């Protein structure tokens, strides 16, 4: 849940503090597969591209968490506005901690879905 809140707030310093220095990160968006192995790469090479400067997160609408064996599942939905209009974005993240931080993470993203 802390990751979803920090990401939706575009608080990348807070995101960085949550990530283990040797994070194993992989993500899947509708058009691309993403990989990163350290917090700076996750932030600059992935998250800042997923939520660009022009993307205004209007609301973190829904967050749910659960446990799947040794992984935590975090599902979250955001309303986003940018010059192209209003969108909803949903992501499912699976997380494992290492030394009290996120050390393993897999994220699947719906992409920016236009709102009528």
Describe the function of each predicted region.
Residues 14, 20-71:
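A solvent-exposed, acidic/Ser-Thr-rich amphipathic alpha-helical stretch
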């Amino acid at each position: 849940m802390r990751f979803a809140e920090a990401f939706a707030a575009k608080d990348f310093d807070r995101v960085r503090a949550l990530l283990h220095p040797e994070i194993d990160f992989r993500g899947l968006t509708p058009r691309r597969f993403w990989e990163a192995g350290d917090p700076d790469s996750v932030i600059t090479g992935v998250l800042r591209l997923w939520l660009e400067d022009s993307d205004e997160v209007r609301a973190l609408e829904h967050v749910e968490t659960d446990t799947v064996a040794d992984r935590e599942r975090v599902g979250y939905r955001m309303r986003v506005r940018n010059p192209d209009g209003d969108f909803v974005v949903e992501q499912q993240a699976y997380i494992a901690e290492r030394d009290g931080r996120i050390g393993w993470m897999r994220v699947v993203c719906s992409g920016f879905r236009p709102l009528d």
